[in-house]
Amino acid sequence: MISALWGALLIRVHSSPVSSPSVSGPPRLVSCGSSQSSALSQSGGSTSTTGTEARSRALGRRWCPAAIMLLALVSLLSCLLPSSEAKVYSRCELARVLQDFGLDGYRGYSLADWVCLAYFTSGFNAAALDYEADGSTNNGIFQINSRRWCSNLTPNVPNVCRMYCS
């Protein structure tokens, strides 16, 4: 998908003259449209389409500033998307993660208890989100409530864990 986006966004344009006596206003460094070179049109000679294409390639190509900004934006978004994708764990995968974090036997609860809790609260979905009637949200695998434990930018919330819910 990313390669298709890059292919669609690779907008190359032909170079245009820096200034032209017949054009009013500030000189344009790059034209975002396709045009024949001014040397060909000023000479009065007629060229075929293939001759124009060959000469256009020889003149060099430049990026349109709007295309550069669009490419930068798409690059930034493509870097951020994989980090925001939801992770849905398998039962064994979640058990390994919880064991690595030392939750087996934590406060008297076995690893099976933690896995059972995660299954029935979120279905092992790390991005699970449930809205309560009071406006608070239950977040993540263990459905931590934003009313007391985390902040979802609601004013006057205790935020005991001192972290954002997202």
Curated annotation (Swiss-Prot):
Residue numbers on the Extracellular membrane side: 84-166
Question: Where, by residue number, does the polypeptide cross the bilayer?
Answer: 63-83
Q: What does this protein do?
A: Sperm surface membrane protein that may be involved in sperm-egg plasma membrane adhesion and fusion during fertilization. It could be a potential receptor for the egg oligosaccharide residue N-acetylglucosamine, which is present in the extracellular matrix over the egg plasma membrane. The processed form has no detectable bacteriolytic activity in vitro.
Q: Write the protein's name.
A: Sperm acrosome membrane-associated protein 3
Binding partners and assembly: Interacts with ASTL.
Which Gene Ontology cellular-component terms appear in the entry? Answer: acrosomal membrane; sperm flagellum
Topological domain (Cytoplasmic) residues are 1-62
Q: Does the keyword Ribosomal protein apply?
A: no
Q: Where is this site: Cleavage?
A: 86-87
Compositional bias (Low complexity) at which positions? 16-52
Organism listed in the record? Papio hamadryas
Gene3D superfamilies linked: 1.10.530.10
Record's PANTHER family? LYSOZYME C, SPERM ACROSOME MEMBRANE-ASSOCIATED PROTEIN 3
Localization annotation:
Cytoplasmic vesicle, Secretory vesicle, Acrosome membrane
Query: Which BP terms in the Gene Ontology apply to this protein?
Result: fusion of sperm to egg plasma membrane involved in single fertilization
| Region annotated Disordered, chain positions | 16-54
How does the protein associate with the membrane? Single-pass type II membrane protein
Q: What are the disulphide bonds in this sequence?
A: 150-165
Domain of life the protein comes from: Eukaryota
Name the SMART domains for this protein.
LYZ1 (SM00263)
The protein's UniProt keywords, in alphabetical order, are: Cytoplasmic vesicle, Disulfide bond, Membrane, Signal-anchor, Transmembrane, Transmembrane helix
| Family assignment from sequence similarity | Belongs to the glycosyl hydrolase 22 family.
Determine if Transmembrane is one of this entry's keywords: yes
PTM comment text: The processed form derives from the membrane form by proteolytic processing.
- Domain named C-type lysozyme is located at 87-166
Q: Which GO terms describe its molecular function?
A: lysozyme activity
